Amino acid sequence: MGMVLFACLLLLIIFPTCGYAAINTSSPLSIRQTLSSPGGFYELGFFSPNNTQNQYVGIWFKKIVPRVVVWVANRDTPVTSSAANLTISSNGSLILLDGKQDVIWSTGKAFTSNKCHAELLDTGNFVVIDDVSGNKLWQSFEHLGNTMLPQSSLMYDTSNGKKRVLTTWKSNSDPSPGEFSLEITPQIPTQGLIRRGSVPYWRCGPWAKTRFSGISGIDASYVSPFSVVQDTAAGTGSFSYSTLRNYNLSYVTLTPEGKMKILWDDGNNWKLHLSLPENPCDLYGRCGPYGLCVRSDPPKCECLKGFVPKSDEEWGKGNWTSGCVRRTKLSCQAKSSMKTQGKDTDIFYRMTDVKTPDLHQFASFLNAEQCYQGCLGNCSCTAFAYISGIGCLVWNGELADTVQFLSSGEFLFIRLASSELAGSSRRKIIVGTTVSLSIFLILVFAAIMLWRYRAKQNDAWKNGFERQDVSGVNFFEMHTIRTATNNFSPSNKLGQGGFGPVYKGKLVDGKEIGVKRLASSSGQGTEEFMNEITLISKLQHRNLVRLLGYCIDGEEKLLIYEFMVNKSLDIFIFDPCLKFELDWPKRFNIIQGIARGLLYLHRDSRLRVIHRDLKVSNILLDDRMNPKISDFGLARMFQGTQYQDNTRRVVGTLGYMSPEYAWAGLFSEKSDIYSFGVLMLEIISGKRISRFIYGDESKGLLAYTWDSWCETGGSNLLDRDLTDTCQAFEVARCVQIGLLCVQHEAVDRPNTLQVLSMLTSATDLPVPKQPIFAVHTLNDMPMLQANSQDFLSVNEMTESMIQGR
């Protein structure tokens, strides 16, 4: 009998600590209880920060230690009673009661329904739901603290003055509101702004479709998790973010020190993606009006071109807040000389890699020339910028908080009196005349030394390659290649690759070759060059291009390939006339051939190779239209048991890069599969991933494919000019395989062997999920290159360096 009583007592003790599914009038949440989200991602309950005696109701990540609190209900009013509880009142509002049953905190709004309950969703949103209608009566996502989760948002509404902001904790042990807040401004376009009290502390620059233009290291090729929606007519705007990584949990937080941080969980610990501000130059207005903060090491303040310190004494003491003043007054005769600038007309000085000043105004000019003319014709216009993803911005008045980045900034044109540049030119002539003779002598000496260095370097290169395992690959002399290509004649140029031009050549024995000439500015250095030679020399497959040899001559580096008569696949499928030469059977054969080449790289060769830059222009076609995978400069070899790797240098072509690779630098067989899926859909549809837009919402190719598959099974995705040559079920099957290859999560994508099996058999296919880039409009996607040539850019980030091509 005693054992039974003990068991009952034990159950009574344990029961209150169990997680609740919901809170209602009859089931309040006590201090010893918690409320879990259905999937177990988040938990709500009472907590004491840093082991203080104060109790708060908060939400945190359930399975992560140490605890990270993402929302607090009673920030200003902690409870100390162990009898406190959270419940639903008779009028439907959520209330927190202390031990005396006094209301400590509430949602502050009474509802007509008293039949409701509160639950915690898997998004981390704590909601009060009407049991009758199912409507949300209140939600924590509309009452943010210091943290944003995916699907929550900052907002403003100028019609009623409302805004939703993040507010810091006062300290790590005190969740009451601190002195810093993060908001989005009602400017067009908006920008993120951290305030210290009411004073601007940091800003991220105007929004440019996929990025905030004032964050260093992030340019138009950045794969952004952010999204901004503004309705100019309604005076509303919102900012949110989504998790593009291969992980479920992430958050944006504002620390008590005023730093905005973005973190995600990789399964072991939290990874920091961004932390802003990160440099003294990021602090608002550090160098005063018309000052320029240069992010050098150490950072320094300068005056903008044509300006001088307002107070030399204060400037010399390091007190730069008074800023600078114009050295020469503007002539402002622009209106009378719109077409021809006289000698007294104001001019614009171009600055590069700049965080543009605050207090911009959007001007609806259609191009940069109109933007320039509009500013020139307005005497109060002190500067203008024409930014990709935004358009024309102008500044009327002081230029405040201008920052000089080392790279990845914007162009800014500041208005100056013409005499400013004229004086500069005269000084340059004097200096140039004085030192020209010295420079000439130095150059002669340098040329001699460079010649000697190149001779030694050339020998070193050759010796280096001799030590490598490059059997079957010949070394060609430069004069042989120059003769074969008619001295790299423009008429022999086949195209432009990501690392330089490609030429057609003919050797003395009549054999035709393709010559890849690596540009010194291309970004492919010694590592990529060595990589491509050593890799391809070991790879032999009918669906891989064959390397015949290489050439090194000083700074010149060349690769010599077998010549492909039909050049690359993109020439055919995107050309309105040539596309008819590739009917559906040929396209299906090309898809299968690429898959076989990938299978060889991933599974069947003696090396396991991840290509990392699979795209339509890297598929060459022989005289029978058989595909051959080319361009192995970015490829990586894996060890026998290795299936995944990561890199700080993310390289590839935007649109083809998988989310986990573009965002986290993780690459594997599955990242090549993602690229293959995009490539498949381009071959089927005849539409470029980087150019195709459809619908009022400017959706891209993946969204178009998803809609096609949902509506017709995908059979209508095929280029309509080719429908007479195909079997609809075969096209629909390929579309479904393509969608499976571009799944957001790598684990949901098939491997290469499975893909080839799907293409060559009639087995049932899994049902694909909606691709992540089909959820958002094209405006929410990363900016993609708009021409057939590859574009190389370098974007340095906290965790990785992205190079889009």
Curated annotation (Swiss-Prot):
Name of this protein: G-type lectin S-receptor-like serine/threonine-protein kinase SD1-29
E.C. number(s) listed in UniProt: 2.7.12.1
Active site residues of this protein: 613 (proton acceptor)
Source taxon at top rank: Eukaryota
Post-translational modification comment from the UniProt entry: Autophosphorylated at Tyr-600. Autophosphorylation at Tyr-600 is required for downstream phosphorylation of the receptor-like cytoplasmic kinase PBL34, PBL35 and PBL36, and activation of plant immunity.
Function: S-domain receptor protein kinase involved in lipopolysaccharide (LPS) sensing. Specifically detects LPS of Pseudomonas and Xanthomonas species. LPS are major components of the outer membrane of Gram-negative bacteria and are important microbe-associated molecular patterns (MAMPs) that trigger biphasic production of reactive oxygen species (ROS) and immune responses in plants. Seems to be only partially associated with the second LPS-triggered ROS burst.
Any one GO molecular-function label of the UniProt entry: protein serine/threonine/tyrosine kinase activity
Gene behind the chain: SD129
